[in-house]
Every structure is written in structure tokens, then in C-alpha cells.
Amino acid sequence: MWDWRVKVHIDYREKYIKEYFEKNRDFENIVETKNLEIGDIIIYINEKPTILIERKTVKDLASSITDGRLREQKFRISASSIPKEKIIYLIEGELDEKLYGRVDKKTLQGSLINTMIRDDYKVYRTKDPKESVYFLVRLINKIRNDKSKLIKIENVKEEDKIR
């Protein structure tokens, strides 16, 4: 059996998410608030940064497309040690027909498609902050409790296999 320690760092600017985890005792020894240089949430397994989550509201996505922040953030994330397949863009809110500044629905969808296809990152959509927290709780608990289902067989050394 192998050792499995999970830690989660949440950027201090993620107010709603931070407040939820600060109030929930189930996560008091797992979740810490930090000033993160990249991403909004980083999940560590055995002290190794393993999953990076960049959370954006639809409005923030639109403004980061317009001012170039999205491209710059993706560049910094791609330079990190976290594998592409473990990077998640958590997009919060509805993509409706209204304009977000100069950005329309077609542009927003195009950006999300590029994120998935060109950049090889995962995109997960939620309707609001409450659903985002629900997703994060499920993700963290899945990692904590179902580790044998999350490890790819080819990545497990013979001596680490469960007997």
C-alpha cells in the first residue's frame, strides 16, 4: 500500500470558495489559503502539485480575452510542472446571447474550444459559485477516498500494488 497525502491550496482572492472551506471542519487539515502565482486552486498529492484549477466567471473570461490576460495566464500555466491533462478551467455562469464588453457568445465558445482542443486542458462548467464549490468538494473527496481508482495501473510500481 502506498502513502497518500492530499493538500489543497486556494488563492486568497477566491472569496466564496475560501469561506466555504474555512467553515467546513472536514477540510481543516487539508485546505489552506495562499497567494498563488498561477491558478486559483492547486491540489497536491504527496506534496507534488498534481491538479491545477483556474476558475473564471463568464464575465471574467470575456474581460481576460479582451485584455490579453487569458493568453498570458495560459502561458504561465503551461510553463508549470503540472501535466496538461491535469489542468482544469472551471467556467462559472451561463453563456447567453448578451455581449460581455466587446465579446459575444461565439467568441467565448471559441475560446473554450481552443482551451480544450488546442491547449489540451479540461473545461468544466458550473452555473454559479455554489455549484463550483460542490464540484470542488466532490473532486477533493474523490481524490481522498478513491485513490485506487484514480491511479493508472501502468504508473504503479510492483512494490506499491495492493496485495
Please name every model-derived segment.
Residues W2-K7, I30-R163:
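Extended, alpha-helix-rich binding/interface surfaces that flank or overlap catalytic cores
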Residues R5-F27:
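Short, charged N-terminal beta->alpha structural module
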